[in-house]
Amino acid sequence: MGRFGAVSYRQVKQSEADTIEIDSLKNGDIEKYNEENDKISRIPLAQLSINKINGIKSSVIEELSLKRPSYFMATKMIKSLLPYYWKKNPFKFRIILCVSIIFFSKLINLSVPLIFKNIINTLPEKVEWHLLILYGVLFLIQKSIWDIRDLLFQDVNDSATKQINLETFDHLHRLSLSYHLNKRTGSLIKIVERGTSSVVQLLSLLLFNIFPTLVELFTVSTFLLFSYGAEFAFINLTSCVVYIAFTLYVTERRTKHRRLANKKENEASDIKVDSLMNFETIKYFTAESYERKRYDFALMDFFQTNKKSKVSYFLLNFGQSSIIVIGTTLGLGLATWRASQNGFTLGDVIAINTFIAQMFSPLSWLGSSYRMILTAFTDMENLFELLDTQPEVSDSPNAKELNFNDTNNPSKTILPSIEFRNISFTYPNKNKEQQQSSPKILDNISFTVPAGKSIALVGSTGGGKSTIFRLLCRFYDVDQGEILINGENIKDVTQTSLRSIIGVVPQETVLFNDTVAYNIGFGNREANDDQLIDASRRAQILSFIESSPDGFRTVVGERGLRLSGGEKQRVSIARALLKDPPILILDEASSSLDTFTERKIQQAINEVSKGRTTLVIAHRLSTIIHCDEILVLKGGHIVERGSHSYLLDFNGDYAHLWNQQQLSASDLQYTPNQDTFE
């Protein structure tokens, strides 16, 4: 069950999607959809980007999906927001005080025109100075009371904003790796930013715009009915009802333009973020003009879509203004005619005109508020879908912490052993039929890493080496079999305790846009300076850090762009050393290092691997000859296993690969039309 109730957003959207699909098939729109898919197939592969694919998708299907918002979901959203506001006594008191201010302000709104009426009616015989002073005081309160209300409510809003942001942030980190691999960072950021601001905006609009307007409509109409007659109450009510109905009708129909504009803006943002994140690659291929054209096309698409939204906005405002003018003119005309018949005083005419004009003032905000509410609903849909998404990998209800303490001596830690038992795995696919027909990445493999020993995995790219590490860290759950650490299935322990004992040096190191010290210290945030320096020295990165003008305060740039590949790799090694984990994973830990530095790093790795359970992925076989056992993976199977010397004597795939790598550079000969060196 999702956070926002028993009926999840995903279930509602699925129901809507099913309806859309049936409608589209009935209308023959699927033929147009297929025609536009044919357009995609005719694009040269080198120019086929995801943005072009999305741009050619059938507009018919898109518009069907944007036809109407779900009021059922809107109700659930409002209920879901209440706990963020109605939670602590100080905040409850402030909300009650703000609502009291609303009723007080409506009494003032009724009093001001009546006082002004009495001032006018006493002229020119005399001037009621006490009424003038009272009018000025009430008018000042009328203008400033909303600022007082906003000031009182600010802390409530800030608290709700903070809580929603933190919950969204935590939820993003709880989601599985596969979710993030299938999402674009730019779109996620936009979803969170727009959705979070809309969540906070929605309740404020309902509480301080819609509710006060309805209260004022009731009080003004009631007063006009008993003080001036049913015709004035009728004009006021009819004008307001027509205004509200027109606003609701037009605004609902312009919502689809807003949704489509959001989608196009997300696509433009994705292109911009991807382009900046691949800054260096763009420079290598002198692709600045091409990227500019891509971004220009996306912006043009967004502005064309947004223009439709702006036109519909103009039509809405024009219609609202027309209704206001007609209602005000009718009320003023009737009051003037009554005055000409000696039925009303001049003060009555001014009071009636003021009441009607004063009523339309919040009504003008009602239209804006309703548009903003629908906009907030539109922006919140993606956020709530995100929050309703459940991670593919989650802790079981009875999950326990991994414990390596010796039962006989609790202060002593037992080194962990690792066992992969009959493991089969295929990466998840939304299309279940495609997943079932996809080849298995791992097919019924079994092996054991004894406590304190090291095992290396070698083989061709795509053979399943990195998949084994991802399964061990439980980024995915296996399709078949079980992974055991000290005899415990990793599905029965918490993910946090599992990953806390594993240190990883990935093949492609991604660093935070922060200092070198922060990135190394990420391995152990409680480490002191001496420990951090020692880890840097053992990773052969200390001399580089000390030679930099800012030392450990050197900022590495976005994703570590200011560092070379070898420097990033050594920072990653230092981070793993600082964590001091009982299980160490080295995924091509020396892949970005020169031969001289590689030898130094290898010595450090050999040293730090002692007393740990270690798994190593390597293409350079010279780095794994010290491992206790080497597994050769091919097609998801273990085809060879044994020590370095045993596998050389076996003279199989490992020996062939070893002999190739031992050839001197002068002996390497590239054969055309082949993908390997011979």
Swiss-Prot record:
Keywords: ATP-binding, Membrane, Nucleotide-binding, Transmembrane, Transmembrane helix, Transport. Residues 95-375 form the ABC transmembrane type-1 domain. Its main location: membrane. It comes from the Eukaryota. GO terms for cellular component: membrane. Residues 418-660 form the ABC transporter domain. It comes from Dictyostelium discoideum. It is found in: Membrane. The keyword Transmembrane helix applies. The chain crosses the membrane at residues 95-115, 128-148, 206-226, 230-250, 314-334, 346-366. GO terms for molecular function: ABC-type transporter activity; ATP binding; ATP hydrolysis activity; ATPase-coupled transmembrane transporter activity. Belongs to the ABC transporter superfamily. ABCB family. Heavy Metal importer (TC 3.A.1.210) subfamily. GO terms for biological process: transmembrane transport. ATP binds at Y427, G459, S460, T461, G462, G463, G464, K465, S466, T467, I468, F469, R470. It is a multi-pass membrane protein. SUPFAM superfamilies: ABC transporter transmembrane region, P-loop containing nucleoside triphosphate hydrolases. This is ABC transporter B family member 6.
